[in-house]
Curated annotation (Swiss-Prot):
Its main location: cytoplasm. This is 3-methyl-2-oxobutanoate hydroxymethyltransferase. Mg(2+) binds at residues 50, 89, 121. GO terms for molecular function: 3-methyl-2-oxobutanoate hydroxymethyltransferase activity; magnesium ion binding. The active site is at 188 (proton acceptor). Keywords: Cytoplasm, Magnesium, Metal-binding, Pantothenate biosynthesis, Transferase. 3-methyl-2-oxobutanoate binds at residues 50-51, 89, 119.
Amino acid sequence: MSQVVHTRRLQAVDLIKRKAEGRKIIALTAYHAHTANIVDSYCDFVLVGDSLGMVMHGMESTLPVTLEMMILQAQAVMRGTARALVVVDMPFGSYEASREQAFLNAARVLKETGAGAVKLEGGARFAETVAFLTERGVPVMGHIGLTPQSVNTMGGFKVQGHGAGDEDRLRADARAISEAGAFAIVMEGIVEPVARAIATDPSIRAATIGIGATAACDGQILVLEDMLGLSDRVPKFVKSYGSLRAHIEEAVRAYADEVQAGRFPADGHTYPPR
């Protein structure tokens, strides 16, 4: 009889252990079951990001993304993964009004998707919310620096940390949500020296995850479509690890040419009579 091997899915606590052991944390975004299945073996966590609004739906920002959209795609990612921790973004408007609103929506995400954690944007001003959630059994990943849900108040997608006092403010944000119980903090779009100072601060227990920050972070994350060359526009911090857009276009062109010429479908692609 063959032996069934059960893979234990990683949990939030495992990321803290990796930080303590000095092991780099690897993460990517995913929105579909098939891409989630591909990255599952290589990632410690997979983020179902509200960036799906821009990547999947062509939105100008993440602001129109709804909780229902996040739940639907998180369900798909859970079906495609077996090993990686799955973290789901709390979309704009789903947690800011009150701690109670945040808990009800976060609990819904975890119950309806089976995901292992939620992520919310904001620093010290949301520390009480982070504590409220973690005290009630919801693992929380924070997000500081360039927070896309604040694009309108930031005046656009602007790198953080250039101004006087920015390092102190960002460090205070990281400390506050770490002390509130966040197991990890995404640090996005922060100038390198400031990001490095925060990432190497021994008082910050949470694992730091960089995206346009510093190699000193405990781990790194990228949007999968950006690093594969599928996106039209990518930020400076993205390194291209593939050019799938060109390969897809070439395949589609070949298909269209063969259909037009009557070469597809050939005999091998049709069903003969019995």
